[in-house]
Amino acid sequence: MARWTAADIPDQTGRTIVVTGANSGLGAVTATELARAGAHVVVACRDTAKGERAAARMPGSAEVRRLDLADLASVGEFAAGTGQIAVLVNNAGVMATQLRRTRDGFELQIGTNHLGHFALTGLLLDRISDRVVTVSSSAYRLGRIRLDDLNWEHRRYQRWLAYGQAKLANLLFTYELQRQLAAAGSTRTALAAHPGYAATNLQSHTESIQGRLMGTTNRLLAQSP
């Protein structure tokens, strides 16, 4: 079987696709290739200046809109300004950060990677015609959902276990969303995607010596997005 590449993306003309975190890394590449295939891409990101620079390099049609997944008010504002779309790509995320809280008080990784996307998907679901794609990671194997301490308030914070919890939540959310869509007879689908070891800014922003080492090994071992 031939290896699938971006050249195999079918024509996306007439479709609007929202990609979170599309100002850099995997999100930027995803948005670029979808725009190249004819989609109108919405670059949803916190830093709109970076988003504008990324969008300027994209072929075809792209617009930039502010979305801060660590602020549920921002998520609500973004959803309120969004019309009908074909696809939502839940890509944005943070990895192995120091213990911090979102504007709403959630631990940053579960709040940004899962809860922000959970809220966004729920608010947009009746306007999505085709699919929801959520980027997960093999790091879900590190995770355990601790509903009794989801926000790491009663135990010593461990950044990689917190990341694993968030990525496991992504997978479980996708599984349950797909189950409910199928049970309702919907033709829409919910999918999770593991990108493999890709050289992005995510690893170098882990705020640790290990993160800086990962940023270095990216150049040697990781695949290009």
Annotate each language-model stretch with its function.
Residues 2-206:
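Rossmann-fold NAD(P)H-dependent dehydrogenase/reductase core
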Residues 209:
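Short acidic-hydrophobic sequence patches enriched in Asp/Glu that either
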Residues 166, 192, 212-225:
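C-terminal helical subdomain
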